[in-house]
Design a protein with these regions (language model features):
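TPR/TPR-like (Sel1-like) alpha-helical repeat modules
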Residues: 295-301, 378, 416-434
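Short helix-capping/linker turns of helical repeat alpha-solenoids
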Residues: 23-24, 39-49, 61-63, 67-68, ...
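Structural register within alpha-helical repeat arrays
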Residues: 15, 55, 97, 138, ...
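Contiguous, well-ordered beta-strand patches that form the walls/edges
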Residues: 473-482, 487, 493-571
Length: 579
C-alpha cells in the first residue's frame, strides 16, 4: 500500500530501503532506472520526479543507503537527478536538497515548483499517512535544524509552547527553557524516526541511534541497536554483537557477527574471524576453526571500506600469518599468500617484508625474482634491527637470507658461512615459536612450525673453521612448506573487478574466453600474475600486475603494466607505462 509514492514506485523503493538483500536492492534500482529511461524517451510516468529523487539518494553514496548494497557513488549523477526531481515537482526532493550541500543553487531556487514550506506540508501529510520515507524526511527537518526556515515546521515545533515574547523573557534569565525546547525538538525527530523505522525503513535506525548517543542515553541506544539488528541492518548487527561481547555473551555475539558477515559487513567479518581464530577472544567457549577464520578474514580484506570499516591491513595480515604458519595443517596455500601480499592495504606495513622475502626467494606462489628477494631481505633485516623481532615471521626472512648467501645472490659468490649463520638464527626462531605457550591465538599451546632451518643445516659440515657441503650435496633442501602438485602454473588471478562482479578471489588459471566474458560486463579488470612473470627489455621487468580499463568503446582500452625498473637501486619503484 502506498501513502505518498505511486504503487509502482513504492514497490521499487521498498526493494532498496525496506530490507538489506543486495540482489533485491539492485532489482529495485534497476526498476527505477528503467522508469528514468522511459521518461528520457518522452513517455509520461506518474510520479517521475520522486523516481529521480530516490535515485539521487542512491547515487549520493553508501551513507545515504546501506554500504553492503554496493551501489556506485556518482556525485554528478546524484546532483543532476536531484535537480531534475525538483524541476519535475517532487516535494521530497526539495527537502532532500536542503540536506545536500550545494544542491539548492540560485538557479534551482528560482525554478522551485513550490515553496520549501509547501514541500514540507506535502511530505508531512505523507508521513502522517504512514510513508516511511516521508517520516524519515520530516525527522531530518527537526534533527538537523531545517525547521528554523520552514513556518509549518516551526508551528509543529511550537505547538503547546508559550508565546515567543514569553519565551524571550524566560531566555533572559535561564538556559533551562532553551534546553527544554531543544529536547522537545529531538523528541519530535525521534518520534518520526521511530515511525519511519516501524514502517520499514531500515536506515532510520541509524539516525535514531545517533539521537540517543547525543543524549548519552545508553539504554535507549542499545534498544535501538537490537531493534535495528532484528530488522536486518548489518551495522546494527555488528553493534549488537559488540554489546554482547562486552557482556561476555560470546555465543550470542557470534550469532550477530555471523549474520552480518553473511551480508558482507567488514566489521562483522573481522569479529567473526577473530572468534574462530583466537579462542582467547571467547575465553575458549568458541572452538577454534581456522578454515572459517580464514574465510572471514579474506572476505573482510576485500569488503567495502567506506564509513564503517577501514581495518583491511589488519585482517589481510591475519590471513597471511594463519596461512603461512599452517596451524591446522590444511591452510597453507602459497598462491593465496602471494595474492594477499599484493593487497594495497598492506603496502606501507613493515610486517610484510619477511613474507615477501620468503615467497620471492623460494618461488612460493611467485616468480623466482632474486633481485626483489634481496631487496625484501634487506628491508626485513633493517626492520628487525629497528624493532627487535617480527614475532611469528623472523624465521622466514632468516631462511631467505641464508639461501641468498648460499647461492651467492648477495655476495656474487656463495658464502656458506653466512648462510649457516642465518639458518641457525632461523632454527632458533622456529624453536622459540614451538616452545612458547603464549601465542597470539590464545590457545595456551605451542605452535608446530616445520623446522625448515634444521633440514637445510643438514647439508653442511664444518671443515677447518669454515662450512662446506657434505659429500654428494650441492645445495641445501627441505621437505617443509611444499608447493602442492596441483598448483596452477602460468596462473593469473582476478584481483578485483568493480561494478558488482561476483568473481571474487581464485587461484585458478584464467583462459581468454573468461577474460572476454568479463570484459563484456566490466569497465575495469585487474590481474595479479603469480608466476611466469614476463619482462620487456630495457622497459619493465617482472610484470606482476596488468590493469585493463576502458570507457564505453570496448574495442579499445588502456593497459597498465606494473613491474620493476632495470636499476636494482630502483627495483621497488613501480613504473606505469601505457600501451
Amino acid at each position: 500500500m502506498s501513502f505518498y509514492f505511486t504503487d509502482q514506485i513504492q514497490q521499487s523503493f521498498n526493494k532498496i530501503f525496506h530490507q538489506c538483500n543486495k540482489d533485491i536492492a539492485w532489482e529495485g534500482k534497476a526498476e527505477l532506472d528503467a522508469l528514468v529511461k522511459l521518461d528520457e524517451e518522452g513517455q509520461k510516468i506518474p510520479g517521475i520526479g520522486d523516481v529521480y529523487a530516490i535515485l539521487a539518494r542512491v547515487y549520493s553514496g553508501p551513507q545515504f543507503t546501506w554500504i553492503e548494497a554496493g551501489f556506485p557513488e556518482d556525485d554528478t549523477k546524484a546532483y543532476s537527478y536531484l535537480h531534475t526531481a525538483i524541476r519535475k515537482g517532487s516535494a521530497i526532493a526539495i527537502l532532500q536538497a536542503m540536506r545536500t550541500s550545494g544542491a539548492l543553487t540560485p538557479t534551482i531556487e528560482k525554478e522551485l515548483p513550490m515553496t520549501k514550506d509547501q514541500a514540507f506540508q506535502r511530505v508531512y501529510e505523507g508521513a502522517q499517512k504512514g510513508c516511511s520515507y516521508c517520516a524519515y524526511a520530516i525527522a531530518n527537518v527537526f534533527q538537523w535544524g531545517d525547521y528554523h526556515i520552514l513556518p509549518s515546521a516551526q508551528k509543529v515545533a511550537n505547538e503547546g509552547e508559550p508565546s515567543s515574547f514569553v519565551r524571550f523573557l524566560k531566555g533572559l534569565f535561564a538556559q533551562a527553557d532553551q534546553r527544554r525546547f531543544a529536547n522537545k525538538i529531538t523528541a519530535i525527530a525521534q518520534q518520526w524516526l521511530r515511525k519511519s523505522a516501524e514502517a520499514g525503513l531500515v536506515i532510520a535506525y541509524r539516525n535514531l541511534r545517533i539521537t540517543y548517543v547525543e543524549q548519552d542515553n545508553r539504554a535507549m541506544e542499545e534498544q535501538v541497536i537490537f531493534e535495528g539488528a532484528k530488522a536486518g541492518l548489518p551495522l546494527m548487527m555488528y553493534l549488537a554483537g559488540d554489546i554482547c561481547k562486552s557482556r561476555g555473551e560470546h555465543e550470542r555475539a557470534l550469532e550477530y557477527f555471523e549474520r552480518g558477515a553473511a551480508m558482507n559487513n567488514g566489521m562483522c567479518l573481522r569479529e567473526a574471524a577473530e572468534y574462530y581464530a583466537k579462542p582467547c577472544e571467547s575465553n575458549k567457549r568458541i572452538p577454534q576453526n581456522i578454515q572459517k577464520a580464514l574465510r572471514y578474514y579474506e572476505r573482510a580484506a576485500i569488503s567495502p571500506n567506506y564509513l564503517d570499516f577501514n581495518d583491511h591491513a589488519y585482517v589481510t595480515m591475519q590471513a597471511i600469518i594463519l596461512r603461512t604458519l599452517n596451524i591446522d595443517g590444511q591452510s597453507q596455500d602459497w598462491s593465496r599468500i602471494a595474492h594477499l601480499l599484493q593487497q594495497p592495504a598492506i603496502y606501507t606495513l613493515d610486517t610484510i617484508w619477511p613474507y615477501l622475502a620468503y615467497v620471492f626467494t623460494f618461488k612460493k606462489g611467485n616468480t623466482h625474482a632474486i633481485r626483489t628477494a634481496i631487496e625484501c631481505v634487506n628491508k626485513a633485516s633493517k626492520c628487525f634491527d629497528r624493532y627487535g623481532s617480527y614475532d611469528y615471521a623472523d624465521h622466514l626472512w632468516q631462511l631467505a637470507a641464508g639461501y641468498c648467501y648460499e647461492i651467492g645472490a648477495i655476495t656474487k659468490e656463495p658464502d656458506l658461512d653466512q648462510a649457516v649463520t642465518f639458518y641457525e638464527h632461523a632454527r632458533e626462531s622456529i624453536n622459540r615459536l614451538n616452545t612458547r605457550n603464549d601465542n597470539w591465538l590464545g590457545t595456551g599451546e605451542p605452535l608446530a612450525i616445520p623446522d625448515e632451518a634444521s633440514e637445510r643445516l643438514e647439508a653442511f659440515e664444518l671443515v677447518d673453521g669454515h662450512y662446506q657441503y657434505k659429500e654428494g650435496i650441492t645445495q641445501s633442501s627441505t621437505t617443509c612448506n611444499p608447493m602442492p602438485p596441483a598448483w596452477p602454473q602460468n596462473s593469473v588471478d582476478v584481483l578485483e573487478i568493480f561494478e558488482d562482479s561476483t568473481t571474487g578471489w581464485r587461484t585458478n588459471k584464467y583462459d581468454w574466453p573468461f577474460i572476454e566474458r568479463e570484459w563484456d560486463t566490466q569497465k575495469y579488470l585487474s590481474f595479479i600474475i603469480y608466476d611466469n612473470r614476463q619482462s620487456i627489455e630495457n622497459v619493465i621487468y617482472d610484470v606482476y600486475s596488468i590493469v585493463m580499463f576502458h570507457n564505453e568503446d570496448k574495442n579499445t582500452c588502456n593497459i597498465y603494466l606494473y613491474g620493476y625498473s632495470e636499476d636494482p637501486a630502483e627495483c621497488d619503484e613501480t613504473l606505469e607505462p601505457t600501451i
